[in-house]
């Protein structure tokens, strides 16, 4: 089984995240996609609880898109992959990353181990993905997703404009907006 691994804070989950997840599954780039929300190991400000982020993500769970917070306590991506390989024996893993991540991929802890995985890289801006792959010595085992419309959304921008109903409606699904309002999340 080919399992895609999509790791992030998802603070909050927005239409861009879901568009990516659906694209990967609908185009059969993987058999199953695991969305793994992380703890706040990097000192991000205004991050809500893991449970609230999981609750918002669960609204998007399907038979092929699985929200898995079992490994959220692990700090590094390579640790998550190691744990997943024990849970899903005999599976192949693909790591989903944005092109902005490939620029500094060699700074990731144990990035050499992650390079052994298939990388599914989402084109962003004008980043020359092939240049960075060559620099990393990754000549095969990757997919560059360039036919997905560029997604100019960031969770930070959404949080910074949490009072602007038009921005919320543009970038978040109604269920997520309702959850944020009900729980009074991201309020200053």
Ranges and model annotations:
Residues 1-188:
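Nucleotidyltransferase catalytic core that binds NTPs
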């Amino acid at each position: 089984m080919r399992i895609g691994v999509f790791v992030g804070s998802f603070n909050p989950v927005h239409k861009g995240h879901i568009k990516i997840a659906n694209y990967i599954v609908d185009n059969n780039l993987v058999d199953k996609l695991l969305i793994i929300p992380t703890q706040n190991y990097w000192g991000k400000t205004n991050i809500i609880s893991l449970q609230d982020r999981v609750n918002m993500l669960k609204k998007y769970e399907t038979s092929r898109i699985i929200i898995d917070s079992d490994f959220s306590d692990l700090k590094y991506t390579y640790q998550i992959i190691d744990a997943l390989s024990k849970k899903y024996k005999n599976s192949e893993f693909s790591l989903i990353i944005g092109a902005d991540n490939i620029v500094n991929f060699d700074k990731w802890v144990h990035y050499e181990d992650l390079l052994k995985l298939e990388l599914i890289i989402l084109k962003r801006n004008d980043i020359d993905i092939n240049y960075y792959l060559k620099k990393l010595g990754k000549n095969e085992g990757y997919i560059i997703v360039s036919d997905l419309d560029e997604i100019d959304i960031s969770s930070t921008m959404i949080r910074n404009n949490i009072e602007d109903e038009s921005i919320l409606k543009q970038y978040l699904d109604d269920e997520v907006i309702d959850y944020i309002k009900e729980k009074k999340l991201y309020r200053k």
